[in-house]
Amino acid sequence: HCLQITTGQVLWEKDLKAQFDAPLRLYGIGHSPLIWGDRLYVNVGGNAEQTGIVCFDKHSGNIEWSATDDAASYATPRIARIHDQDCLFVLTHQHAVALNPHDGIEWWRIPLSIRIVDAENAVSPLVYQDIVAFASYGNGTVCSRILPGGMKEELW
């Protein structure tokens, strides 16, 4: 639901399970969205094609773009401006993903699948200057330097 902050009036709503075939994860649907400008980014994890990450217009609820076929995590997406370019970082259930937040074009991904039963990725990407780190449950941590154009150089 998108609510008017002072009155609580419902402005628009989406049934993520119905619209995107988003499965109930281990702890149910518990997305932690990100608002940036006029957009709302959600790690939906839908089973419908290319509905892993969905960007909505925050005013209308209209879909701006959708990308990846990854299942959802409980991590909040993160946007950072690096080398004069906006970068969207998302930890999904299977990958660390970097995308262009304006059009959803995927720049790169790093495998970080859960290797333990009854576990979920939940740590939001950490950004410091031009470095981004992703931590997964049971599959370690990766750290990369973001290069101009959105590409990466793995540090560790």
Report the location of each language-model feature:
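Noncatalytic, solvent-exposed loop/strand surfaces
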Residues: H1-W156
